[in-house]
């Protein structure tokens, strides 16, 4: 089973509420080093935490991070972008590009860049933070990018399994961070989510459904489209 004891962890989006919790909890679990990455990485007061500049939308930045962090055993694709409006037709072009590059292409190219590094280790892990919106298309391009990442995570899991790289996908509704500040639905505490994710990693699980919303939405994938989206059923009456 994968273990955080002695692990070298890289966290994207480490300046944010969820990323900061991943940094601290990885160390609590026994990680020997954590690369805390962001476009403008903050200063930490722990010598085990290494600030590292990384823009997940920039291929050159991704390659530079892989070159600088060749000892990584756990890659946590946590960085994400959201949108101000719900529909693909109302998003700005910049919102669409930012979401595609941050939520999908960034984790994808990070996994590709770090795959040789992780494959060379005895125990290694990739954690991809998805969303319950992976399975519920009301978030426009945000939902679309998270669905794409879910599919890519499933593919990478199969491709990397022979090399011993364990790939975990995480689905959750709202988390109490700045990104969800305007949401009025119940929110999960970041520390609780991180604890659940790291428990799942060390238990060898492949997928984390962190809340009831995620459980229900995944179960609904096999239902008729009209059951998931009642507004479509109304049009057929």
Name what the model sees in each region.
Residues 46-58:
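Rossmann-fold cofactor-recognition segment
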Residues 71-72, 118-130, 162-166:
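Active-site loop of short-chain dehydrogenase/reductase
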Residues 111, 145-146:
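Active-site helix of classical SDR
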Residues 82-97:
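Conserved mid-core segment of classical short-chain dehydrogenase/reductases
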Residues 169, 177, 181-223:
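C-terminal helical subdomain
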Residues 15, 19, 23:
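N-terminal Rossmann NAD(P)H-binding glycine-rich loop of SDR-like oxidoreductase domains
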């Amino acid at each position: 089973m994968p273990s955080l004891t002695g692990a070298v962890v890289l966290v994207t989006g480490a300046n944010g509420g969820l990323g900061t919790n991943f940094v601290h909890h990885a160390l609590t679990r026994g990680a020997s080093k954590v690369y805390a990455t962001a476009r403008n990485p903050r200063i930490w007061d722990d010598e085990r935490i290494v600030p590292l500049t990384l823009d997940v939308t920039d291929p050159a930045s991704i390659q530079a991070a892989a070159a600088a962090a060749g000892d990584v055993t756990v890659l946590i694709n946590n960085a994400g972008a959201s949108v101000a409006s719900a529909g693909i037709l109302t998003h700005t072009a910049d919102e669409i590009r930012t979401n595609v590059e941050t939520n999908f292409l960034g984790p994808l190219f990070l996994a590709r860049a770090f795959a040789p590094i992780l494959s060379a280790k005895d125990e290694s892990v990739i954690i991809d933070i998805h969303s319950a919106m992976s399975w519920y298309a009301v978030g426009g391009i945000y939902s679309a990018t998270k669905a794409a990442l879910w599919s890519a995570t499933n593919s990478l899991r199969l491709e990397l399994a022979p090399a011993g790289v364990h790939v975990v996908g995480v689905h959750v509704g709202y988390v109490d961070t700045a990104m969800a500040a305007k949401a009025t639905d119940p929110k999960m505490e970041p520390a609780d989510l991180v604890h659940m994710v790291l428990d799942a990693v060390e238990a060898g699980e492949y997928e984390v459904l962190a809340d009831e919303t995620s459980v229900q939405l995944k179960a609904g994938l096999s239902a008729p489209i009209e059951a998931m989206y009642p507004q479509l059923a109304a049009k057929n009456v």
